Structure formats: structure tokens, C-alpha cells
Amino acid sequence: YTDPATSVTHTGHGLYEQNLPQETAHWPSARARGMAMHESQSLFVEKQIGRNPAFWAFALPHVEKHLGEHLSLDALLPHIHHVERGLIRVDADEVTYPLHVILRYELEQGMLSGTLQVRDLPEAWDAKMRDYLGLSTIHDPKNGPMQDVHWPGGAFGYFPSYTLGA
């Protein structure tokens, strides 16, 4: 995990699973509704709760206890709401995050429709990154189209679910 937001996101996944009805756990209706629902809940917790000053007023004393150092709420909040273009989707702020998802969705559509060949993906990725975020990745493969686990693992069509809770 690279930052507290990642922990808060995964807490959202856990809270969703934890609060499914246990008394009917053996029935399909009591199971998770799929990854779209999972992502909506995790991103809701991250983006709506985890960026709220009231959450950090509550959580900060617990964080301080485990880190063993004092952290100021006034010093922390600007970092939580900082907006800056970046190459990595999972590290993106609340303004640019949807652009990362849209970029991936559009590239997936091109690959699935046959208008974009896989061999042309690095250049197409770079063009979209420059158009949407003003950043180039053409000479930086680790921040290019394989930075997420989805496509190398064959998971296409997943990225739009990341916008449901944002």
C-alpha cells in the first residue's frame, strides 16, 4: 500500500463483505453482488468518507497511536485534497481519477472493436495520457498500459466499475 487512501479503500471492501447478511449467508441473495458493487463501496469509503475532515478528526488519534508521532489535522488535510496530474491511476486525486478510468475504457473499446491493435497500445496510451493529463509515458513503460493488473490478467471491461463510488 502506498498511502492511507489505499488502506481506506480496502476497508471499504471489508466493510461491504462484513455487513452482508450472515443469517442467510447460504443463499445467493446474501452474497456480494459482484465487483461493480464492491468497487462502488470501496471507492465511496475512500473518496467520500476518507477525504472528509470529520473522518480524519476521528481517525487521526488512532493513527498517531500506532505511528508514535503527532500529526496535525491542519497539516494533513491539504495532502488529502491535493490535486496533481499523475501517471498512476491508484495514486490519482479525485479530479484526475475519472480521466484515468475513461482513458482505459476508451482503449479497451478500441482493442475489443478491432480499431486498436495490441501492438499499438503503448503509443495510443501515450497519446491519451498527453491529451487528458498532459503527461507522456512513451519512454516510461512501467507507467504505461500494463501498470494495472487487469489487462495482463485478461480482465477487460472492469475499469468503469471504479467510477461508481467516486
Describe each PLM feature range.
Residues 15, 42-46, 107-110, 165:
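Buried hydrophobic packing segments
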Residues 96, 154-166:
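C-terminal substrate/ligand-recognition segments
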Residues 1-22, 39-43:
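Active-site recognition of the HExxH zinc-binding catalytic motif
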Residues 1-3, 25-32:
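Conserved binding/catalytic microenvironments
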Residues 35-49:
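An active-site-proximal "capping" alpha-helix that borders the catalytic cofactor pocket
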Residues 5, 35-39, 100, 104, ...:
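Short alpha-helical patches at coil-to-helix transitions and adjacent helical residues
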Residues 49-153:
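Long, amphipathic alpha-helical stalk/connector segments used for oligomerization, subunit docking
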Residues 30-36, 88:
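Divalent-cation-assisted or electrostatically stabilized phosphate/pyrophosphate-binding catalytic cores
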